[in-house]
Regions:
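A generic secondary-structure signal marking the coil-to-beta-strand transition
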Residues: 1-2, 104
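Active-site-proximal alpha-helix that buttresses catalytic centers in soluble enzyme cores
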Residues: 3-6, 10-71, 75
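Phosphate-handling substructures
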Residues: 69-117
Length: 117
């Protein structure tokens, strides 16, 4: 068995430097083109299942890949993005101003200890 992990394409939050967690933000036009390109790369790969987060940005990509193989994506809640609390949708500049200690910990070797505000 081979498992491929694929990240969704660009969203407005990614493009604009905003934190993105569980907000259901769709792909931009560029992100959709990226998703279509990924689906094209999987056209010749044997795919028997496509699993996805329920968020639109991931489900769009999963749907494109699955369609190439006459499959339907299977939604798994456990694949939902990390809940980033108050920082969801916030610019990194705003995060630095409001939560400097959090960002310092998050960027450190002990980043796994960081608690989302």
């Amino acid at each position: 068995m081979t498992l491929y992990l694929v990240r969704h394409g660009e969203t407005a939050f990614n493009r604009d430097g905003q934190g993105l967690g569980r907000k259901d933000v769709p792909l931009t036009e560029r992100g959709l083109a990226q998703a279509e390109a990924v689906a094209g790369r999987f056209a010749t790969v044997k795919v028997t299942r496509v699993l996805s987060s329920p968020l639109a940005r991931a489900l769009t990509l999963a749907g494109l890949v699955a369609a190439r193989h006459q499959l339907q994506p299977e939604v798994m809640e456990s694949l939902t993005e990390l809940d980033i609390g108050e920082t969801d949708g916030m610019s990194f500049a705003e995060m630095r101003g409001r939560f400097p200690d959090f960002l310092k910990t998050w960027a450190s070797d002990d980043g796994w200890r960081a608690r989302m505000p």
